[in-house]
Amino acid sequence: MRVLAAMSGGVDSAVAAARAVAAGHDVVGVHLALSAEPGTLRTGSRGCCSKEDAGDARRAADVLGIPFYVWDFADRFKEDVIDDFVASYAAGETPNPCLRCNEKIKFAALADRAIALGFDAVATGHYAQLENGVLRRAVDADKDQSYVLGVLTAEQLSRAMFPVGDTPKDRIREEAAERGLAVANKPDSHDICFIPSGDTRAFLGARIGVRPGSVVDADSGEVLAEHEGVHGFTIGQRKGLGVQGPAADGQPRYVTSIEPDTGTVRVGSARNLEVDAITADRAVWTSGSTPVGPVECTVQVRAHGGLAEAVAEAVDGGIAISLREPLTGVAKGQAVVLYRTDPAGDIVLGSGTISGTDARPNTQ
């Protein structure tokens, strides 16, 4: 089988490529150039798409004895990931750019080009398990990335490979060292690659500008402060609110809702964050078939968030989710990923983009 190995320059994708070679596949390595402007992506060992990473990926390919290329996806990345990120925050939403990159770049634009060139699959270093179209959590629960892959369709998964998902991260590093890969001890990347400063608010402000609004008490409606734009806030945020003192009940204040049309940011105590129901649009069902009737499942609403038991039902191209227990910090624009518990690793059932939430009166 001809396999295109997406090599980010990190240890996981290097070992993924190595395992594809060891499995007897005809492997070609490729690194994605994602910025047309030098210096706009992070440089150094902590980046996931920096200039240094391209060199690390090339050296890993040399060790493996496979051809290596750098493909320019800067325009697509800007349009589908960066511009989407900015527009979502301007609309009072909280997007996940890594998730969007998987959906639109790695397993769409990149995979489409790979298939057009005669490749059968794209291998990446994601921590997830995939077999016969079934996407599961990784063996290493701390590194599991099934959440950011939960937006992939059955067709996209049919041409994907995740060779490292069945192995703990520590063992992957050991294997990299055994194979003579210099990236064996390279630190993991954690931040957003196109915000090298790590200052998301400044990045967004430079692109959106000042759009004044008010910070309002969620219970009393009192105006507590003014702000320069809803893009500086996300649901559950506690710091940087521009408000002095706790809520009326003596508890810390959090962002509880964002109203982009009026520029209103409401803040309140933690109880104001609790939701019992989630509505999502852009539903994707991993099996390719939309389920009929209610589905018992667990849901995850953040990349490193916990699971909550729920009942989900497909509704008009979206998903209606009723939670067994309240969740906090649920924001529009986030992905909600549905799982079915399984001893071999929880199975991804599907996902949607959160478009609304609701709470029972007694939780307010």
Swiss-Prot record:
What is the active site of this protein?
C101, C193
What are the residue positions of the site described as Interaction with tRNA? H126, Q334
* Swiss-Prot/TrEMBL catalytic activity: S-sulfanyl-L-cysteinyl-[protein] + uridine(34) in tRNA + AH2 + ATP = 2-thiouridine(34) in tRNA + L-cysteinyl-[protein] + A + AMP + diphosphate + H(+)
Q: Does the record's keyword annotation contain RNA-binding?
A: yes
- Is ATP-binding there in the keyword field? yes
Lineage, broadest ranks: Bacteria, Bacillati, Actinomycetota, Actinomycetes, Mycobacteriales
Give the encoding gene's name: mnmA
Gene Ontology annotations of biological process type:
tRNA wobble position uridine thiolation
Q: Give the start-end ranges of region Interaction with tRNA.
A: 143-145
EC number assigned by the record: 2.8.1.13
Task: Kindly list the GO CC terms recorded for this protein.
Answer: cytoplasm
Keyword vocabulary terms for this entry: ATP-binding, Cytoplasm, Disulfide bond, Nucleotide-binding, RNA-binding, Transferase, tRNA processing, tRNA-binding
What are the coiled-coil residue ranges? none
Give the species this sequence originates from.
Rhodococcus jostii (strain RHA1)
Extract the Gene3D superfamilies matched here.
Adenine nucleotide alpha hydrolases-like domains (2.30.30.280), HUPs (3.40.50.620), Translation factors (2.40.30.10)
Q: Name one GO molecular function term.
A: ATP binding
What is the protein's name according to its record? tRNA-specific 2-thiouridylase MnmA
Top EC group: transferase
